[in-house]
């Protein structure tokens, strides 16, 4: 699959993939997450703010620990557009962005923005994951493992927190379920 991506690289697609890597990476995604956490907190949706922070932060911590356990080398550097430090499995970009997309979907699901947020979150996570393969810095299994790990982590966290913070299951804006 990585050979297919390499054979279909174009300068335009490479620029898009590199931009996704930056936005979904350690410099920008945490700032986006913190901005949304702050907005939720200011809006009085403290359980939602805590959930988003724990979802993305916990996925990041889980990723670091998992990489240290498996220590899988990255794909051949000759295949890659970028050079990334550290181990390959699971993809940190895929894991953090999937956690972000799933968490904001769960937060806004009962609001009017539910479907658009769900679609945007899913599309975003898929685009970031595909970009990691396109750039040659991860195997497809790294991306899949990162996304699935985040799915299990974030949904499990949501169910657990919902037991102790029932307000988490409502809309952050206090809207009624319009479905």
What are these regions (language model features)?
Residues 1-28, 68-81:
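N-terminal transmembrane-helix/juxtamembrane module of multi-pass inner/ER membrane proteins
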Residues 31-33, 40-115:
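Membrane-interface loops
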């Amino acid at each position: 699959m990585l050979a297919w991506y390499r054979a279909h690289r174009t300068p335009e697609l490479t620029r898009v993939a590199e931009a996704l890597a930056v936005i979904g990476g350690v410099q920008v995604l945490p700032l986006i997450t913190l901005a949304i956490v702050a907005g939720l907190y200011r809006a009085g949706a403290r359980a939602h703010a805590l959930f988003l922070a724990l979802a993305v932060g916990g996925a990041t911590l889980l990723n670091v620990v998992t990489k240290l356990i498996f220590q899988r080398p990255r794909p051949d550097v000759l295949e890659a557009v970028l050079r990334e430090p550290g181990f390959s499995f699971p993809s940190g970009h895929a894991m953090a962005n999937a956690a972000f997309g799933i968490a904001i979907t769960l937060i806004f699901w009962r609001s009017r923005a539910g479907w658009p947020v769900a679609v945007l979150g899913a599309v975003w996570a898929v685009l970031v994951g595909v970009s990691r393969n396109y750039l040659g810095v991860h195997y497809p299994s790294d991306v899949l493992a990162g996304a699935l790990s985040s799915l299990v982590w974030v949904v499990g966290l949501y169910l657990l927190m919902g037991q102790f913070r029932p307000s988490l299951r409502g809309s952050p804006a206090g809207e009624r379920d319009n479905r």
